[in-house]
């Protein structure tokens, strides 16, 4: 795996690898759900914003965590791959940072700037990696904001090197408050047993908009009578934590991440308890559809996830579904879409 820097690859090389490649692709009522997932139903909505899309070219970026990942995702994924995965869907995407090596934060930002400026892919905005507790966080934000595509920051909180309570340290809170001042969001991706920290974080930073990733990293197996493997938490502890978080008006929830822990043969009914609890708890104005592609491939294809979510939400009001599939992402992230 090569670790490039801005000094040894050109804009043209990057766009050839990512943006130009995309053109080649062109040659609450879960009881009544069907248990199979069909391949290509109609799109669930006339406009879809995927609020959580990953892209990584391992010739450009070093992702330490990917070295021990499942072979399904331990490879490069380009805009062309995403276009193929979303064929037939009226979808645009918000890039989500991919936990690159520490010395590549600015490089990732530059690559995304060039990709988005090319206007040749479905990706039109970005949530970038950042270190809120870093002394140079303000300068980093200025550099990223100058690129014009930044909507928010994420700093992974569930990696083994990050101790519990990191997001509540004084310097971290200072950085999060700065995001609020600059009208930028913070995506929270945290261990499910530490969700109560999100309540404190949101309380301490009331002027910052938070987006909780992946239904709080819920493990859908917790709701199965006989799961194939032990879930990461109990159903009740996750439910109570999510209810506490939802009381904070400055936290929204991404509806995603529920397919990944599932074993082969899952059905929409298996996912419905987690999805419906989030939709009901956060309300129709604070939920966002997200794919988590390509990480979702650990449990199913992007289209399978879209189809399942469409079935789970089919009985909800059309206005609520419009908010889920696109409108909320546009408003919460301040998107030009």
Predicted regions and their residues:
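Conserved, mostly hydrophobic/aromatic
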Residues: 52, 93, 126, 179, ...
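Alpha-helical scaffolding within the catalytic cores
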Residues: 76-82, 137-139, 196, 235-242
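Catalytic pocket-lining loop regions of alpha/beta-barrel enzymes
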Residues: 165-288
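Active-site gating/metal-coordination segments in enzymes
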Residues: 103-194, 200, 216, 232-233, ...
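Short, electropositive alpha-helical surface patch
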Residues: 103-119, 208-212, 270-280, 305-312
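Mid-to-C-terminal alpha-helical segments outside catalytic/metal-binding sites
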Residues: 2-4, 8-51, 60-84, 88, ...
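Active-site neighborhood of phospho(di)ester-bond hydrolases with catalytic His/Asp-centered motifs
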Residues: 49-51, 96, 127, 154, ...
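Active-site gating loops and adjacent loop-to-helix segments of metal-dependent hydrolytic enzymes
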Residues: 57-92, 146-163, 208-209, 216-221, ...
